[in-house]
């Protein structure tokens, strides 16, 4: 069988002509010599990851519970989805001719069949037949792509066995998946999954269901911003008190939108292409200049890694394959891949920008999932549009305020400053609180010269998915800037205020964002016996960001504003005086000044570290004093 390409030029050309855009390029011919720099980056990173996975693959035929699996440097268990690596391994085997990659692909499949394979055709997330089976769709896509593009390098016995196994998995997905049977990423991903499985197996029923689901998913985009929604429990269409849907940027850009784009291009689905183009443009507003994804507000940000989401696949296919519509999509694909490279060490992708500097071991899950989309890009390379970094990202050129009505989230930009303020009240779970940035909090603060300065974490780090997250090392200190007080060992903060609203004014010189917030505990009970209501304002000018916190109520308990500044331990910190701190970064010096003394929260070591989004930080705090009812904090960069 010769290597084939599902997504043909005709689809790319059609969508390029039907969606007017100043950035459309000619999609009617191949680009074998274009995008060479990005191709080299992609190829080299994929090889680095595959070789890294080879180093942790277990070869122990005497113990079938581990033989063939990928040992995780950070987790005590084996990840059931490690068989997803079959696709990148087989790709590497095909292009390199090296038998070691074929053997690696066979080994991960052997482990899966011995440990997570079920009679009904499913695979489970761990070696427990009662555990979650929805992940079958991801393994099935990996196996289908392996067989479609690279089956010619397999021996007949393996080819037959894997084809039969794919048929069983496909039948399970066909029988059990609907568009909204759980979080939208599963039904959405099954659209492409059933389609490609149907092609590999010649099963028309699978393709018909895929087409039906592709029509159904079009109802799951928000009214104003075309953000894909449905990442919430117990129903995908659950609304918050403000009437907002559950949206998660990480799952959307790294998983579901990939599936929708690849299906729509492959089948020339013009209706779906129109919608996903609008959706990609909206999601792209949240990419930061360095290629990081701003998921500070996302419903499932408990898996936010700055470059994406812990167990998703990567955003490269959706954005790269649509770069003929908007060249900035291509920029996004390149910049994010560069960030993935920066977060890679010893052949494995680490879960955030400061994992390596903090000495936090990586979870192998990041690598075997993010290797798949790189293989997919390379398998389609001759049919991709031109991909480069020449077109600026929206957040690079932004100047002013952008309000996402469907999230109640504000993006602000002035000079070199970029920031996100959130009053988003949607919740992932209907019983438990996995708090993302809200309550008028600053989810992101970024400066073009020095990079990321602030990034939200969970209010309290929680192992929402214990098999897909790493334990928090050391003391858990939230990274989200906030107002806080403690009373009778209860923590009260605006991070739990889901009723806050935002106001914004741009004078062309200064952007002013304001919110009235209340201090509440995790049970949403407001603090009593001390000030509970505060005015929180952010004023952004070219010269810097000024944060003011004030109240008209009596402050009877120690109350502070906390500003954690992202900073790896190698950066020099100077306490100029009790009101001023300087942090030296490669691109400049960050200065924090306040009208009251600045202190650091207590923690061990030289920095605190938070798993979300994988950052080291200096948790600066400043307390209200008896005669002062307004805190004034200024952040500047020179």
Curated annotation (Swiss-Prot):
It comes from the Bacteria. One of its GO terms (molecular function) is chondroitin-sulfate-ABC endolyase activity. It catalyses: Endolytic cleavage of (1->4)-beta-galactosaminic bonds between N-acetylgalactosamine and either D-glucuronic acid or L-iduronic acid to produce a mixture of Delta(4)-unsaturated oligosaccharides of different sizes that are ultimately degraded to Delta(4)-unsaturated tetra- and disaccharides; Elimination of sulfate, appears to act on linkages between N-acetyl-D-glucosamine and uronate. Product is an unsaturated sugar. Residues 1-27 form the signal peptide. InterPro entries: 6-hairpin_glycosidase_sf (IPR008928). One of its GO terms (biological process) is carbohydrate metabolic process. Its EC number is 4.2.2.-, 4.2.2.20, 4.2.2.8. Optimum pH is 8. Optimum temperature is 40 degrees Celsius. One of its GO terms (cellular component) is periplasmic space. It is found in: Periplasm. Keywords: Lyase, Periplasm, Signal. Induction: By ulvan and rhamnose. Belongs to the polysaccharide lyase 37 family. This is Broad-specificity ulvan lyase. It comes from Formosa agariphila (strain DSM 15362 / KCTC 12365 / LMG 23005 / KMM 3901 / M-2Alg 35-1). The lineage of its organism: Bacteria, Pseudomonadati, Bacteroidota, Flavobacteriia, Flavobacteriales.
């Amino acid at each position: 069988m010769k290597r084939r390409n599902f997504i043909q030029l005709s689809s790319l050309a059609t969508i390029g002509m039907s969606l007017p855009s100043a950035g459309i390029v000619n999609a009617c011919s191949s680009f074998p010599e274009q995008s060479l720099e990005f191709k080299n980056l992609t190829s080299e990173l994929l090889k680095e990851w595959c070789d890294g996975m080879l180093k942790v693959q277990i070869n122990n035929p005497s113990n079938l519970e581990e033989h063939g699996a990928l040992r995780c440097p950070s987790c005590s268990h084996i990840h059931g989805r490690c068989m997803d690596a079959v696709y990148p391994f087989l790709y590497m085997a095909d292009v390199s001719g090296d038998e070691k990659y074929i053997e690696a692909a066979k080994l991960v499949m052997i482990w899966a069949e011995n440990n997570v394979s079920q009679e009904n055709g499913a695979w489970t997330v761990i070696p427990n037949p009662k555990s979650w089976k929805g992940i079958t769709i991801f393994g099935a896509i990996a196996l289908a792509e392996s067989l479609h593009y690279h089956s010619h390098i397999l021996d007949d016995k393996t080819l037959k066995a894997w084809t039969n196994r794919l048929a069983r998995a496909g039948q399970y997905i066909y029988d059990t998946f609907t568009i909204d049977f759980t979080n939208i990423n599963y039904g959405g991903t099954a659209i492409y999954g059933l389609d490609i499985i149907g092609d590999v197996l010649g099963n028309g029923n699978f393709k018909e269901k895929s087409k039906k689901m592709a029509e159904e998913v079009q109802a799951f985009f928000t009214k104003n911003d075309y953000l894909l929604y449905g990442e919430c429990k117990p129903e995908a269409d659950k609304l918050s008190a403000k009437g907002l849907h559950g949206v998660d940027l990480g799952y959307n850009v790294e998983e579901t939108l990939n599936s929708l784009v690849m299906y729509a291009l492959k089948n020339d689905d013009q209706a779906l292409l129109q919608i996903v183009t609008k959706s990609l443009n909206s999601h792209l507003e949240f990419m930061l200049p360095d290629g990081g994804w701003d998921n500070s507000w996302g419903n499932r940000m408990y898996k936010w890694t700055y470059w994406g989401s812990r167990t998703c696949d990567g955003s490269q296919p959706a954005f790269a394959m649509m770069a003929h519509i908007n060249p900035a999509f291509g920029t996004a694909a390149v910049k994010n891949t560069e960030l993935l490279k920066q977060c890679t060490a010893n052949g494995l992708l680490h879960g955030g920008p400061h994992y390596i500097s903090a000495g936090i071991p990586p979870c192998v899950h990041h690598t075997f999932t993010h290797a798949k989309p790189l293989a997919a890009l390379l398998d389609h390379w001759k049919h991709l549009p031109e991909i480069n970094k020449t077109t600026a990202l929206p957040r690079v050129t932004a100047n002013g305020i952008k309000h996402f009505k469907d999230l109640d989230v504000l993006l602000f930009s002035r000079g070199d400053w970029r920031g996100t303020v959130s009053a988003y009240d949607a919740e992932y779970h209907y019983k438990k609180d996995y708090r993302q940035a809200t309550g008028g909090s600053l989810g992101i603060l970024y400066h073009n010269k020095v990079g990321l300065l602030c990034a939200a974490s969970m209010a309290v780090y929680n192992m929402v998915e214990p098999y897909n997250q790493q334990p928090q090392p050391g003391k858990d200190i939230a990274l989200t800037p906030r107002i806080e007080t403690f009373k009778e060992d209860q923590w009260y903060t605006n991070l739990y205020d889901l009723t806050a609203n935002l106001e914004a004014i741009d004078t062309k010189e200064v952007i002013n964002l304001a919110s009235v917030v209340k201090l509440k505990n995790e049970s949403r009970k407001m603090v009593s016996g001390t000030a509970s209501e505060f005015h929180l304002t952010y004023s952004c000018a070219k010269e810097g960001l000024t944060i003011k916190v004030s109240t008209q109520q009596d402050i009877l308990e120690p109350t502070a504003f906390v500003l954690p500044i992202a900073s790896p331990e190698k950066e020099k910190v100077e306490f100029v005086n009790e009101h001023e701190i300087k942090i030296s970064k490669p691109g400049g010096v960050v200065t924090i000044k306040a009208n009251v003394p600045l202190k650091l929260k207590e923690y061990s070591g030289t920095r605190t570290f938070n798993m979300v989004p994988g950052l080291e930080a200096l948790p600066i705090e400043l307390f209200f004093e008896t005669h002062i009812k307004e805190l004034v904090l200024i952040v500047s960069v020179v």
